[in-house]
Every structure is written in C-alpha cells, then in structure tokens.
Amino acid sequence: MKILKRIPVLAVLLVGLMTNCSNDSDSSSLSVANSTYETTALNSQKSSTDQPNSGSKSGQTLDLVNLGVAANFAILSKTGITDVYKSAITGDVGASPITGAAILLKCDEVTGTIFSVDAAGPACKITDASRLTTAVGDMQIAYDNAAGRLNPDFLNLGAGTIGGKTLTPGLYKWTSTLNIPTDITISGSSTDVWIFQVAGNLNMSSAVRITLAGGAQAKNIFWQTAGAVTLGSTSHFEGNILSQTGINMKTAASINGRMMAQTAVTLQMNTVTIPQ
C-alpha cells in the first residue's frame, strides 16, 4: 500500500520536470527567432551609402529621358559657347535665345550644323530661330523629367564621392555636390538606363575617366545637375549632361555624350561626340 501511495507523487514530479524542459526549449527557440528577426531588421535599415562598389536595381524599370529635338545637338546652350581653338565637335551646335554672336566656335571645329537665332555667328552657321526655340524648350522638358524621377535606387552613394565605384543601372540621387576624383565604371546592358540626379555641382578631376562596360551605352546615361559641371583637364566623360547652369570643360577633356546647359558652355581644345 505504501508503494501505491508514492506513485502519484512520482508522476507529479515527472510531469513538472517535463513541463520545465518544454518551456526551456520554447524559450530558447523564441530567443533564436527574435535574434534572427533583429538581425534582418537591422540589415534592412542600412542606407545605400553602405554599398561600397555597386548595387542592384529596386525593381523599377527606368524609361529613357526624352530629349526631343535637343537630341540632335552635341552642344546646346541658352547664353553662349566660348572656345579655345581647336576643339573637335561631332553633332549639331546651337545657342538660344542669345544672339549667334555668342557662339565663338570656328566652322572647322564642327562636324555638323551650327544653328543661330539671327544673322550673327560663325560664317557657316544656319539661322533657324524656330528650331532652336523648340530644341531649348525640349532641353528644359528633359531636365525637368530627369529631376522629377522619384524613389531613387541609391541615395547619396559614397557620401557624394564616387571614385573607384562601378555603377549599375538605376536611379541615383545626391542631395549636394558630386565629386569624381578617380576613375569609375558604368556597367550594364545596351538597353539599361542610368539617371543621376545631383542637387549641387558635379566635379570631375583631371585625367579621370568614365569607362563603359557590359554593353552600356552613353546615349542611355543622363546626368541632371542643378549646379555647374566641371570636367578636369584630359578627363573623359560618358553620357548626356543636363545642367541647370553652366558646363566647363578644361583643356583637352573629352565627352562621349551631349552637353545641354541652361547658361553657358566653355570649351578649351575639347572633343565632344554625340553618342550613337
């Protein structure tokens, strides 16, 4: 009888031990789950400035910036084009609404047509104020379109200094000046699009190069800058520049792209080639 009386007591003790083990196991599992969740949450909160070399698109498909009639121009300016002879420009050149006298290029520097709004300007110029008005209007529309794109894939990449980086397709935005002190690569396919929004100036150091890789096309690259653009001596640039102010090319700098300035373009023995 004494043995039978002890059985319920042992059963209670065993059940208690099993319950404690189960609770410890559940607590351990919950702790691991919470740790995993916290790590994931922290990683998801990292800004795009944490990406050191390149990155991936957010999933949005970028449409090209429509340049309209302005697409025919290698250089288009509202207030004039100055030049230190001899530059080599492939593509049309124009200035409006400023007088043609503000186009200081010589005819043998341009493989294309020089357009002016009046009878002044280089001897080989063609006067076509209507075409220039349309082109300059399209330049403004293109600038606004590029500046108005939302939800950037990268915000303030490199804290505004992107030397040494490889830039994959997407929408990039900097809320201040952008500096390119060393070579960069733009890598993607022939149909990919890049739009770079710069709230300040864009400065490229001397002898620095932008290289295209993987089939990337200069015609699909757009640099929208609220401030001035300066390309250092002997540097090489790729893409279409849409500047709200001026574009200054230092001695022997080159660009495979277009230069569209809402003020002046300054040349010093430069090479400008409209992309195909």
Swiss-Prot record:
NCBIfam families per the UniProt record, alphabetical: IBP_CFB
Q: Does the keyword Plastid apply?
A: no
Q: Which organism is it from?
A: Flavobacterium frigoris (strain PS1)
Task: Give the temperature dependence.
Answer: Active at low temperatures, even below 0 degree Celsius. Thermal denaturation midpoint (Tm) is 56.4 degrees Celsius.
Q: Where is this site: Ice-binding?
A: 251
| Main location group | secreted
Read off the domain note. The ice-binding site is formed by three T-A/G-X-T/N motifs.
Per the Swiss-Prot or TrEMBL annotation, the motif Ice-binding site motif (T-A/G-X-T/N) 3 is positioned at 263-266
Q: Which cysteines are joined by disulfide bonds?
A: 107-124
Protein name stated in the entry: Ice-binding protein
Q: Where is this motif: Ice-binding site motif (T-A/G-X-T/N) 2?
A: 245-248
Q: Which UniProt keywords apply?
A: Antifreeze protein, Disulfide bond, Secreted, Signal, Stress response
What is known about its subunit structure? Monomer.
Outline what the protein does.
Answer: Has antifreeze activity for survival in a subzero environment. Binds to the surface of ice crystals and inhibits their growth. Has high thermal hysteresis (TH) activity, which is the ability to lower the freezing point of an aqueous solution below its melting point, and thus the freezing of the cell fluid can be prevented protecting the organism from ice damage. The TH activity of this protein is 2.2 degrees Celsius at 5 uM and 2.5 degrees Celsius at 50 uM.
| Matching InterPro entries | Ice-bd_prot
The UniProt family comment states: Belongs to the ice-binding protein family.
Where in the cell does this protein reside?
Secreted
| UniProt short sequence motif Ice-binding site motif (T-A/G-X-T/N) 1, positions renumbered to this chain | 79-82
